[in-house]
A protein has these predicted regions:
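Extracytoplasmic/periplasmic beta-strand context in beta-sandwich domains
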Residues: 56-58, 120, 141, 174
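Short, strongly hydrophobic transmembrane alpha-helices
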Residues: 16-44
Length: 226
């Protein structure tokens, strides 16, 4: 029976090659598009390092405020500041961990003194960030709470940035300029895929070491590890 099906299909191909070619191409394209959509969706939800616990994450990207005097349906929406994030989420008892970090990476120049600068993607975080996300360290370690609270200028960088600046991944303890300010490397991690859109960056620093402060609010995002 199966042999007969193949024989009939082959005969059909020979009798109407153009129609058969269009049918085969259309079927292949439809399958390809379905697979592409499935893969794109899978990338968004499937756990992989450093976002291995995606199924336990709750992200708070933006907040909204409204006022009766503004009228029905009118509101102001946007990322939250540090004070708001701390007041609303750091005191929660249900999450295993709560991390606060800038809501997007910012292209920032890095270089060694006397050398041309190059742009990298910078993310400013707290110390809990390194508990929530599982980065693969090849050298050194992340900054801890004491370093974060003190606002020390330290940074975790990727392997590619380490090689670009120092021509080696053995960069712990070495100094470089981040946006013209001196920073010391505390750790080096494996490069992170841009598909890990929450944890992705090329350089991570404590937000207490920059111009961000409790009186100068910047847009921040919060991730709750449930």
């Amino acid at each position: 029976m199966i042999k007969q099906y193949f024989t009939q299909a082959w005969a059909q191909l020979r009798q109407q090659p153009m129609i058969s070619a269009v049918s085969i191409a259309g079927t292949a394209l439809a399958i390809f598009l379905i697979m592409l959509v499935v893969m794109m969706q899978q990338v968004k939800v499937a756990p992989f390092a450093p976002e291995s616990n995606r199924d336990r994450f709750l992200h708070v990207h933006y907040m909204s405020i409204t006022n009766k005097s503004w009228g029905e349906g009118n509101s102001s929406n946007g990322p939250m500041g540090i004070k708001t994030a701390l007041e609303c989420f750091k005191s929660l008892k249900t999450p295993e961990a709560v991390t606060i970090y800038t809501c997007m990476v910012i292209s920032t120049p890095v270089n060694l003194p006397g050398q041309p600068a190059t742009g990298i993607d910078l993310l400013q975080t707290d110390d809990t960030f390194w508990r929530v996300f599982d980065f693969s360290f090849v050298a050194g370690k992340p900054y801890d709470q004491a370093t974060f609270d003190a606002g020390l200028p330290v940074a975790v960088i990727t392997e590619s940035v380490a090689r670009r600046l120092f021509q080696t991944t053995e960069a712990v303890g070495r100094e470089f300029l981040l946006n013209h300010a001196p920073y010391t490397v505390s750790g080096v991690v494996k490069d992170v895929s841009t598909l890990a859109n929450t944890a992705y960056a090329q350089v991570w620093v404590p937000y207490t070491s920059t111009a961000v402060s409790y009186t100068h609010l910047r847009a921040h995002e919060t991730t709750l590890h449930l």
